[in-house]
């Protein structure tokens, strides 16, 4: 059985000074703030694409 999941991100501004929000559409678990600074420096309560991929990989690995 195939499972389809979706999320989307809305970004405002340029790469370094801008910010965005990633929404987990399928689960409805929430909307998370993302910034370049949080991705490359201190997280300061924000997530990053790498953290979201790590969470997905970790949960898939444990179900294998």
Report the location of each language-model feature.
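Extended beta-strand/beta-hairpin segments
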Residues: 1-58, 62-64
